[in-house]
Amino acid sequence: MSAKTVQGRNGKKPASPAVNLIAGGGAGMMEALVCHPLDTIKVRMQLSRRARAPGVKPRGFVATGVEIVKKETAMGLYKGLGAVLGGIIPKMAIRFTSYESYKQMLADKETGAVTSKATFLAGLAAGVTEAVAVVNPMEVVKIRLQAQHHSLADPLDTPKYRSAPHALFTVIKEEGFSTLYRGVSLTALRQGTNQAANFTAYTELKAFLQRVQPEYSNTQLPSYQTTFIGLISGAVGPFSNAPIDTIKTRLQKTRAEPGQSAVSRIMVIAKDMFKQEGARAFYKGITPRVMRVAPGQAVTFTVYEFLKGKLENSGWAFVGGNYEE
């Protein structure tokens, strides 16, 4: 069960799509429940206008979190969770299934070996695939919900978007279906670079641990080791594409002006950010984003490997072999 081959243990085929669906969906759901509050803080920091006021220090991630809880209760940290949970199962199913498919296409036809370049390209393609299929529409709805500053403790403080389904319906009704794909190019670029870095780092670290621990060369690593390398691999992506994520968030939060193209909107947003807030604005929310993504990947890989192993050992008809990271 080497990390750098598509061949499963004892010559079996890789895990079936059903295994990826169940294990990936379960892992993604756990990731969302554990890490969503940090994502809400990240979005609020990226949308904050405090940095535009002269002499006003931008609020940090801890202060932002405290402010949300104080004004909106702790449940305010989970705004948009419904949209995330609604898309997490297909997102993870598409991520792992498409990554495995692309990896098989790029593997050596005779030996099944997968190079680091092939791993990077497979991760890149998987990230773009999930962005177009699931992530962008989900994030448009999520960001609209997270951007609302109403208090969940006050029943008279009625928000525009009451839930994820209501937000989805309202956005489509008022702004059109195409709004769900606003910023899709940036989302695809972000997800592609994220998964390219994520899968490459995870695979290389897993291969290294298997080399120095021969007893795990053809089996799963201990869960604590999977968690550790998942944490490291998850921290790589955010630093490489933070400006993309910040611009994307602002693009998806606001309405489009009539006749304005996506490219021109991106340029206007980037120009205004730099002019009014400086270069640091492009890295707004980087701390909570790393704190959100890195633990999220640690949870995802750990839970995924655990569930996948259980499913494969259960003897279900779903099993097609061992999925390789």
Swiss-Prot record:
Ranges: Solcar repeats: 15-105, 117-208, 221-310
UniProt keyword 4Fe-4S present: no
Recorded family membership: Belongs to the mitochondrial carrier (TC 2.A.29) family.
Transmembrane segment boundaries: 21-41, 82-102, 121-141, 187-207, 221-241, 282-303
Topological relation to the membrane, as annotated: Multi-pass membrane protein
The enzyme's E.C. designation: 7.-.-.-
Name under which the protein is recorded: Mitochondrial citrate transporter C
Subcellular location: Mitochondrion inner membrane
Keyword annotations from UniProtKB, A to Z: Membrane, Mitochondrion, Mitochondrion inner membrane, Repeat, Translocase, Transmembrane, Transmembrane helix, Transport
GO cellular component annotations of the record: mitochondrial inner membrane
GO molecular function, one term: succinate:fumarate antiporter activity
